[in-house]
Amino acid sequence: INYPPVKIDRAHQLVAGKRQLFREMLALGCQFISPSQHVADAFNSLYGPGRCRIINNGIDMATEAILADLPPVRETQGKPKIAVVAHDLRYDGKTNQQLVREMMALGDKIELHTFGKFSPFTAGNVVNHGFETDKRKLMSALNQMDALVFSSRVDNYPLILCEALSIGVPVIATHSDAAREVLQKSGGKTVSEEEVLQLVQLSKPEIAQAIFGTTLAEFSQRSRAAYSGQQMLEEYVNFYQNL
C-alpha cells in the first residue's frame, strides 16, 4: 500500500516504543530479513551483528511469465522515450519534482512518459498514462522506453527497478542507497541530477553503455539473471531449511 505523505511527522515520538517491540521480538527468537543491505546494516547497528539477514527482492513468478512474453526492443524510433513511474506522482520523496520539470524543459529533445496517479506534469513533450493496474500493460509500455528515470529518496529495494531492468530497460537513477544497491547487482551505477539531464537525451544503447559499461544486449542478459524470482525463492527456501 502506498500511503500519502503525512502533514505532521510523529515518527520521532514513536521510535522508542517500536525499538522496544523489536527487542522483545528478538528475545522471543524472531528472525528478521531485509531485502536490502543498507536497511540490514542499520538494523544490525541497533540490535547487534547478524540480527537481520539479507535476501534481495526478485521478480515474482506471475511477472516472470509476463516478462518472458515481451520481445526485446533494441532500438526505438524518434526522440528518446523516458519513463517516470510512481504511485502518486505529486510526492516529492518518490519523484523529484524539480528534476522532472528540468527534463520537461528539454522540450522536443525527449518524450517524457509518466505512469501514476495525480500527475502534476503537463507539457507538449509529456504523455501521462495514469495509474496502470494491469502489470502486463505497464511492462509492455515500459518495454518501449529508452530508459526509466528513478529519483526516489524513500525506497528500500524498489521492485520497479528490478522489473524495468529485467526487460532490458536501462535505469537512470539519482544517488540513493536503494538505487545504488539494486543497480550494482547488474553492474550499474547511480548518477547526479546534472548527469540525468545529459543521459536522457541519448539512445537506449548509449544509455546502457554509460550506466552499465557494456552493450545493450549484454546488459539485458545480465539483468535478466540478476533479478530472477527463482534466485530469491531459492534463498528463502535455504533460509527456512536452516532455521
Regions found by a protein language model. Give the residues of each.
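Conserved catalytic-core segment of nucleotide-activated headgroup transferases in glycan assembly
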Residues: E75-F121
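Aromatic "clamp/platform" in nucleotide-sugar-dependent glycosyltransferases that forms part
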Residues: R153
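A charged, aromatic-enriched C-terminal amphipathic alpha-helix characteristic of glycosyltransferases
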Residues: L70, Q198-Q201, P205, Q209-N242
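Carbohydrate-associated surface elements
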Residues: H38, G58
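Membrane-proximal helix-turn-helix segments that form the acceptor-binding/catalytic region
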Residues: H12-F32
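Short hydrophobic beta-strand element within catalytic cores of glycosyltransferases
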Residues: P170-A173, R180
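Short alpha-helical donor nucleotide-sugar binding micro-motif in glycosyltransferases
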Residues: S140-M145
